[in-house]
Design a protein with these regions (language model features):
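P-loop/Walker-type NTP enzyme "switch/lid" segment
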Residues: 1-39
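C-terminal lobe/tail of nucleotide-utilizing enzymes
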Residues: 104-231
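Conserved catalytic-core segment of NTP-binding enzymes
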Residues: 28-162
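Generic alpha-helix detector with strongest preference for long hydrophobic helices that associate
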Residues: 14-22, 50, 63-67, 71, ...
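Phosphate/oxyanion-binding active-site loops and adjacent basic polyanion-contact surfaces
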Residues: 23-34, 79-83, 213-225
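Generic serine detector
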Residues: 3, 8-9, 14, 30, ...
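Short, surface-exposed, charge-dense and proline/glycine-enriched linear segments
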Residues: 17-20, 28, 76-83, 133, ...
Length: 231
């Protein structure tokens, strides 16, 4: 579930971040709203936040409360450049937040009872959107311009996220969780039906070759879930 109206909280949370740096309990509590939400979700095994592509105040508050995050990637230069911003920003937020919480007096700490007392977020991995390939004689052909960018991903992920966020300098962990091709009309169909793609049926408009694509999507998600579990 979600609503665009949540964006109206952006300025409020942004202003209260200044209170965190001043160790004001009000700003700390307001920026811990997602800590509080997760505390109320203890009957669930997993809680997922589907975030927009921004380093704004709402996403900051979400990330500080989460155990892990996954980043989507595209085969374009902007995705590569964004990794540095994500790594630097999240490292700074995490350090500032944990330092403030560690220095709270006992009275203020009691007001946060039942919530996590530090940000422990780790980078879990990335999923990239496959580019649309050219076809020649029925065979898909790679596009060198896209492949050049994709080849940079593992090293950039290691440098900006694995090392900065996870302190993983070994280079042994595979952070590529999987890739997703373009599913064209199945995506708006899924949104209109309020269902995941793998749950779409003829009632939702699935016909002909759509069924194979629904099965393909389900198989891809299974692969990604297994990779997440292994990481």
């Amino acid at each position: 579930a979600g609503s665009p109206k949540l964006a109206s909280s952006e300025d409020f949370l942004s202003g209260d971040w200044k209170d965190i740096k001043a160790q004001e309990i009000r700003g700390i509590r307001s920026n811990m709203l997602f800590f509080d939400l997760l505390r109320k979700c203890d009957e669930y095994d997993f809680v997922f936040f589907d975030m927009g592509p921004s380093l704004g105040a709402i996403n900051r508050a979400i990330l500080l409360a989460c155990d892990y995050f996954i980043t989507p990637m595209s085969s374009d230069l902007f995705s590569i450049l964004a990794l540095e911003n994500i790594g630097l920003s999240l490292s700074e937020w995490k350090m500032t937040f944990n330092k403030v919480l560690a220095n709270l007096n006992s009275e203020d700490r009691e007001g946060l009872e039942g919530m996590k007392q530090e940000c422990t977020i780790k980078f879990l991995g990335y999923i990239y959107q496959q580019y649309i390939t050219k076809t020649s004689d029925g065979n898909k052909r790679i596009v060198n311009a896209y492949e050049t960018i994709l080849r940079q991903l593992p090293a950039k992920i290691k440098e900006n996220l694995a090392e900065k966020i996870n302190c993983d300098f070994s280079g042994k962990q595979n952070y590529e969780l999987g890739s997703v091709p373009n599913f064209y009309s199945l995506i708006p169909m899924s949104q209109s039906a309020h269902k995941p793609v793998f749950a779409l049926t003829n009632v939702d408009g699935v016909v002909g070759a759509h069924y194979q694509k629904v099965k393909e999507y389900s198989d891809i998600i299974d692969t990604i879930v297994n990779a997440i579990y292994n990481n």
